[in-house]
Amino acid sequence: MNFMVLPPEVNSARIYAGAGPAPMLAAAVAWDGLAAELGMAAASFSLLISGLTAGPGSAWQGPAAAAMAAAAAPYLSWLNAATARAEGAAAGAKAAAAVYEAARAATAHPALVAANRNQLLSLVLSNLFGQNLPAIAATEASYEQLWAQDVAAMVGYHGGASTVASQLTPWQQLLSVLPPVVTAAPAGAVGVPAALAIPALGVENIGVGNFLGIGNIGNNNVGSGNTGDYNFGIGNIGNANLGNGNIGNANLGSGNAGFFNFGNGNDGNTNFGSGNAGFLNIGSGNEGSGNLGFGNAGDDNTGWGNSGDTNTGGFNSGDLNTGIGSPVTQGVANSGFGNTGTGHSGFFNSGNSGSGFQNLGNGSSGFGNASDTSSGFQNAGTALTRASSTWADSPRAWPIRAPSRLQVWRTRATTARECSIRVIISRVSSTGAPPQKKVGNSG
C-alpha cells in the first residue's frame, strides 16, 4: 500500500494510532541490558581462559590444554560480537523511536483533518443557493495542504526508518563463527520452520514478525493484544486493522466492527464517521445504508434526524421527503416544513397532495382550508375558491351602509331628468310635432 496516494485521514490516523514510541524505547532499554550482560559474560570468560592458560605455572598444560583453549576462543569471539550486535540493536531502536517522533510531529493531527471534513460537510449541506462555494474551495485547498503535509512526513519517516534498518546486521550471520557442533540443530529440532528465525521484538508474542508489543497472536503485528495479521494498535481482532479495539478487517480508527470502516464505533462495512451502523454511511449516528449526515435511520437519507428512505433535510419521517418534517408523524414525497401525509408542498399541511399552509384536506392550495380541492383561505367546504365560505356565501352577512348626500343628490337629479323626458314624449305623441322653442326674453 503506497502511503503517497492515501488521504490524510489514513496517514494521520496511522501515525497517531498505537502505543507511540514507548515500546521502541523499552526495546532499546532491553537491548542495552542484554548488551551489558553479554559484555560481562565475555569479560568473565576471557579472564577465566587467560587464568587457565597463561604462564608456566598455569593449570592447563600440554597439548590437550592447548586444544581446549583453541576450542574456547570461538565462544569468546561470539560473546564479543553478540555484545556489539546488542549494542547496535539498542542504538537502532533509539534511532527508530526518534524517527517516529519526528514523523508524528510533522504529521497533521487527526482532529484537524476531521474538523476540515466536518466543515466541508456542513458547507455542502447548507449550500442551497451556491453561497458557500468560495468557502468550500478554501476548505478543499486546506485539505490538499494537509494531504501534502502528511505525505512529506511519511516520506521522511520512510527514509529514516530505512536508514536505521540498513544498519542492522542479521543475527544469523553471527552463528557462523561458532563450531559446527553448536550450529547443528539437535535431533528434537528437526522440522522447526525456518520462519521462526525472524526476530519478534516484544514480549509473549505468538507468531512471526510481531514487533514492539505484548501478547500479539498472529503475524506481523505492531502493538499489544492483537489477534490476526498486520494489525497496528491495541486489542484488534482481524487483519490489517489500524487503531484500537477493532473487530474485522482493514478498519481505521477505534471500536469498529466490520470491514473498511473509517472512524470510531462503526458497525458494518465501509462507513465513514462515528457511531454508524450499516453500509456506506458518511457522518455520525446513522443506521442503514447510504446515509449522509447525522442521526438518520433508513437508506439513502441526506441531512439529520430522518427516518425512512431517500429523505433530504431534517426530521422527516417516511420516504422521499424534502425539507423539515414532523418528527412524530409519517409522510411520503413531501417538500417543505412540518407536512404530514403524501405529496405536499408548503408548510404544516395534512392530507394528500396539498400546497400552501396548514391545509387539512386533500388537494387544497392556499391557507387554512379544511376540506378537499379548495383554493383560497379558510374554506370549510369542497371545491371552494373564495375566501372564508362560512360567511361570504350568505347575502345576509354582507354589511349595509347608509347612502351619502352625494348619492341622494344624484338619485334626485336622475329622477327629475326622467320626469322631463316623459312630459316631452307625451306632448309629441298628442300634437304630432315637437314643442316650439320660445324666442325672446322669458319673464
Swiss-Prot record:
This is Uncharacterized PPE family protein PPE13. GO terms for biological process: biological process involved in interaction with host; response to host immune response. It is a multi-pass membrane protein. It is found in: Cell membrane. InterPro entries: Mycobac_pentapep, PPE_dom, PPE_sf. Keywords: Cell membrane, Membrane, Repeat, Transmembrane, Transmembrane helix. It comes from Mycobacterium tuberculosis (strain ATCC 25618 / H37Rv). The chain crosses the membrane at residues 15-35, 38-58, 59-79, 181-201. It holds the Pfam family PPE. Belongs to the mycobacterial PPE family.
